[in-house]
Amino acid sequence: MLRLPEAHRDLFKKPFGTLYTSVDELLPRLEGRAVYAVGDVVTHNLLAAGVVPDIAIIDGYTMRTPCNRSPLLRARRLTVKNPPGTITGELTDAIDEAVRGQPAVIFVDGEEDLAVIPLVLAAPDGAAVLYGQPAEGVVLRLVDTAAKQEAASMLSIFVRE
């Protein structure tokens, strides 16, 4: 298991991609791409806009509060444990499996906030990874070599336990 040290948490508050105020604003950027969503609200908003994500990673919460917008997706469901502030091997294995066999929903018992990092590393070039930026909107990261390098750099800050 990898744990994000408390001293480095602020580094992860900056958007890891382009920040949009709403899903509707970024819809044209998703055309022809695999779409991967992290978070219940982002997934719900994509579905409301008519976009079914190829992979959704959800935990039933938004900003630590139970989410009444948890999306209902008809896709293979993988359930994993991932405590807050961590990236577990169970989560990364599920992400790898989901990327190989889309569509899939990964339901996280714990917290899915940091899943965007291993998701970018596992996603094929050209995929669109979206996640919520609390009280600001939605972040879109298009996967390419630079995105994977930045994700690997972020992962290097974590401590193996």
Curated annotation (Swiss-Prot):
GO molecular function, one term: GTP binding
Catalytic activity: 3'-dephospho-CoA + GTP = GDP + CoA + H(+)
Top-rank EC class of the record's enzyme: transferase
Keyword tags: Coenzyme A biosynthesis, GTP-binding, Kinase, Nucleotide-binding, Transferase
GO terms classed as biological process: coenzyme A biosynthetic process
Origin superkingdom: Archaea
Pfam families found in the cross-reference section: DUF359
EC number of this enzyme: 2.7.1.237
Pathway terms, separated by semicolons: Cofactor biosynthesis; coenzyme A biosynthesis
Binding site for GTP: 40-42, 59, 112
Family: Belongs to the GTP-dependent DPCK family.
Known function: Catalyzes the GTP-dependent phosphorylation of the 3'-hydroxyl group of dephosphocoenzyme A to form coenzyme A (CoA).
HAMAP family: Dephospho_CoA_kinase_GTP_dep
Protein name in UniProt: GTP-dependent dephospho-CoA kinase
Classification of source organism: Archaea, Methanobacteriati, Methanobacteriota, Stenosarchaea group, Methanomicrobia
